[in-house]
Structure formats: C-alpha cells, structure tokens
C-alpha cells in the first residue's frame, strides 16, 4: 500500500496522486498525456515501448516503471551487513546499530527487514489527540484510528522533515520523541515506551541512522533530471 494511510495499492495509481493533488502539481492526467504527446521524442518512445501514442495510460505505466528502479542498497550499513566490509562502520555506528536492533529500543520491530519497515500501520504516540485520523478514514475501524504507514528509513538522514505530518525537523527531535515514549494515546503501539537513553546513546543511534544513506544511489546521474 502507498500513501501514509494506505489508500493507494499500486504504483500506477500512486502516480495520479501528486500529479492531480491540488496542493502539489494540480494537473489532469489526461491533459498531461495530451501535452506530452505533442513532444516528438516522448511520442516515439511511447510507440516503441507501449505500441500506442503518449496518453494517460503510458504516463502512469512509464512513471511507475521508473519508480520500480529506485532501489537503494549500497549504504555503509549494507556494505557492513551484507558485503562483510567490517570497516564500513565506525565503533560509534556499530554501537548505534546494536542499540537500534536491541530489545531495549525495539526500533527494529517496526523498522526491520531490507527496507527498514514492516509495511504495517502504527500509532507512534506523536500526539495525545491527532488532527489527522490516519487509516481510520479508510477503514472506519477504531483500531486503525490515528495509525499511519511505517516509513522506510533508507536514506533517512536526507528526508527531513519527519513524522507523517512533517512536524519534526531533525533526527534529534525524532530520537527524543521515542526516548520519552511518545504521548499517551489509546492506540499507541505497546512497543513505544520510555527508553531512558543517555546523551551518548542518542548520538550513537543518530550516527547509525546516517549509515543508511546510500550516496551511490543518491548521486546516480541516471536518476537526476
């Protein structure tokens, strides 16, 4: 599922959201296809790849196809964990990694697996009362109230602001939120409890999170406009 409340179930459908959303591009997918069809280069590629002129069908499929190539997997953490390059992480970063995956913090319970997400919907106690009701809007299930999709942490050092509403400007604020155990909320995940981290431990965690930055992926010229 895509989007923070999980309201979109395919990449092809997800393409429509930023394109047509009023607060983003505010454009019509049909009109977008028609405009691109006037550009000879795009029309040639469309005929070659999809055997049809550029239109809304091609726009959604082509963009989704490109998005499926955006796979990040060569960060310092990947080099250390998957490629057995012990020198890829510093002692500080290794301490942070061990803390991240420990039963003390439970970070890895939600942010595990290759993409550092369990793909579930959780309430992390960001607020005692949320303005946005999250997944509840779609399901009307009380157990889904104020729950949002657990995001991937890959390249998280570059994706501020954080939380579903962008209310935290840096990783220090995020770590402190989890350190105090979030706010009291009926649907808050039972995994989120006070961590009682000291200053050095917070710095270790943040150092580890920065090891998830894949500079090779970020600087890939083929992925730039």
Segments (PLM) and residue ranges:
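Periplasmic c-type cytochrome electron-transfer domains
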Residues: 1-225
């Amino acid at each position: 599922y895509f989007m923070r409340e999980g309201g979109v179930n395919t990449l092809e459908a997800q393409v429509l959201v930023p394109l047509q959303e009023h607060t983003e591009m505010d454009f019509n997918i049909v009109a977008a296809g028609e405009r691109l069809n006037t550009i000879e280069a795009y029309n040639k590629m469309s005929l070659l790849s999809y055997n049809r002129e550029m239109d809304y069908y091609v726009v959604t499929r082509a963009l989704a196809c490109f998005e499926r190539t955006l796979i990040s997997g060569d960060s310092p953490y990947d080099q250390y964990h998957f490629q057995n390059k012990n020198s890829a992480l510093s002692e500080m970063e290794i301490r942070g990694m061990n803390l991240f995956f420990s039963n003390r913090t439970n970070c890895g319970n939600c942010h595990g697996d290759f993409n550092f997400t369990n793909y579930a919907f959780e309430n992390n106690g960001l607020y005692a009362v949320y303005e946005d009701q999250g997944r509840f809007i779609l399901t009307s299930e009380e157990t889904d109230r104020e729950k949002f999709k657990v995001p991937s942490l890959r390249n998280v050092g570059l994706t501020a602001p954080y939380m579903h509403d962008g209310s935290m400007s840096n990783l220090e604020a995020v770590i402190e939120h989890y350190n105090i155990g979030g706010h009291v909320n009926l649907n808050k995940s039972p995994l989120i409890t006070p961590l009682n981290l000291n200053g050095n431990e917070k710095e270790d965690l943040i150092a580890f999170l920065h090891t998830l930055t894949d500079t090779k992926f970020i600087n890939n010229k083929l992925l730039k406009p």
